[in-house]
Amino acid sequence: MIVKKKVQSCIKLQIEARSATPSPPIGPALGQQGINIMKFCKDFNTRTADFEMGLILPVVITVYVDRSFSFVIKTPTAVFLLKKAAGIKSGSEKPKCVSVGKVLISQIYEIAKIKLIDMTSLNLESASKSIMGTARSIGLEVEDNL
C-alpha cells in the first residue's frame, strides 16, 4: 500500500525559466514553509533548462508536513503569451477604450493549443474564445488572417 504524504500547504508562484534564485519572491515564500530554497532553485533551473530564457512560468509547489516538496510547472500565462505575440510590454490601462496592439486569429489558435493542457476547455474552439476574451481584456484587437 502506498502511503500518501500529508500536505502542509500549496504555494503558487510565477518564475522566469532557468532563473530561480533565493531572492524575493521565491526565498521568502519558500523560507516561511521551511523548504530548502537552494534545492528548489537547482531543481527548477534543471527542469526548465530547455525552456526559452525570459519565459514566465506558473509553478505550483506542494509542501508536505515533513518539509519535503514537489512542484508542477504549468504552461506560460495567456497574458504573457499574448503580450509576446503582440510585441508589447504591458496591457492597456483602459482596455475597452484604448487599444495597445493587435493579434491575429492564427496567433490566438497557437496560444490556445499551448494553453489547452492547463485549461478546463475541452476543445480548441472554446479555448480560443477564452484566449480572445483575455486578449480584449488587456487591450488587444483580434484580427482575422487575410
UniProtKB/Swiss-Prot annotation:
One of its GO terms (molecular function) is structural constituent of ribosome. One or more lysine residues are methylated. GO terms for cellular component: cytosolic large ribosomal subunit. Keywords: Methylation, Ribonucleoprotein, Ribosomal protein, RNA-binding, rRNA-binding. Disulfide bonds: none annotated. One of its GO terms (biological process) is translation. Belongs to the universal ribosomal protein uL11 family. Forms part of the ribosomal stalk which helps the ribosome interact with GTP-bound translation factors. This is Large ribosomal subunit protein uL11. It comes from Blochmanniella floridana.
